[in-house]
Curated annotation (Swiss-Prot):
This is 4-hydroxy-tetrahydrodipicolinate reductase. It comes from the Bacteria. Pfam families: DapB_C (PF05173), DapB_N (PF01113). Its main location: cytoplasm. The active site is at H153, K157. SUPFAM superfamilies: Glyceraldehyde-3-phosphate dehydrogenase-like, C-terminal domain, NAD(P)-binding Rossmann-fold domains.
Length: 263
């Protein structure tokens, strides 16, 4: 099975290429990067000190024609462009990009009518196990506990809160029979007054090279429960994405990591 990697010269792209090269049963079919990138025209393994035989291209159509599945951790506008080309060519897509609007996320179902699409705000097996723990806790602690979600990422991340943090908020809200849009508080400043009952607060930290830390805090009177996941490297994301690519190859429909992991 051949896999194409979008954003091939980036940190995540390089991790994905390395993971594909080390995974039995899959090969690197194409490596895509933005027009003007210094990586275009070079072997996809140059930064890794490896020779892959795959040349980085900015021609999306040419690249996707050489692959069964595209793994995309880029930006929303680029991902949507890739999805359009993939649909025309019948190439499945694994989406790890975050920062989509609600309308853009809703469009994934339409793409799934023609090709296989896996979309998840986080591909890590550990994070998806954490999602399940949060769901259980949210049901048990539905009364008498305030919910706060704290996330930290590196200084280069461009969206906030993170897609993973938002997913955690959605899980809490849905487990308690509500909608995140009705409960979310994304900023506090100045004299905010007492905390409003039932809200789900978000706090965002950006700095250094933090790969990704997420904590859901259930704060009650006299006790608090914290469920935390910390990523030390991007390797778990890459391994989960390749696992998702193997799962979705040859399928149609919209899937998430619960489907991939059989949760």
């Amino acid at each position: 099975m051949k896999i194409a990697i979008a954003g091939a010269s980036g940190r995540m792209g390089q991790m994905l290429i390395d993971t594909v090269l080390r995974t039995p049963g899959v090969t690197l079919g194409a490596a895509l990067d933005r027009p003007g990138s210094d990586a275009v025209g070079q072997d996809a393994g140059v930064k890794l000190g490896k020779t892959t035989g795959v040349i980085v291209t900015d021609d999306v159509r040419a690249g996707l024609s050489q692959a069964d599945v595209l793994i995309d951790f880029t930006r929303p506008d680029a991902t949507l462009n890739h999805l359009n080309v993939a649909r025309e060519l019948g190439t499945a897509v694994v989406i790890g990009t975050t920062g989509f609007t609600a309308e853009q996320k809703a469009s994934f179902k339409t793409y799934g009518e023609s090709i296989g699409v896996v979309w998840a705000p986080n591909m890590s097996v550990g994070v998806n196990a954490t999602f399940k723990l949060i769901e259980v806790a949210a049901k048990i602690l539905a009364q008498g506990y305030d919910v706060e979600i704290i996330e930290a990422h590196h200084k280069h991340k461009i969206d906030a809160p993170s897609g993973t943090a938002l997913k955690m908020g959605e899980i809490v809200a849905e487990a308690q029979g509500t909608k995140l849009a009705d409960r979310a508080v994304y900023a506090r400043e100045g004299e905010t007054g007492p905390r409003e009952l039932g809200t789900i607060g978000f706090a965002t930290v950006r700095g250094g090279d933090i790969v990704g830390d997420h904590t859901v805090l259930f704060a009650g009177d006299g006790e608090r429960i914290e469920i935390t996941h910390r990523s030390n490297t991007r390797q778990s994301y890459a391994e989960g994405a390749v696992r998702a690519a193997v799962y979705v190859a040859g399928k149609k429909g919209l899937y998430d990591m619960n489907d991939v992991l059989g949760l």
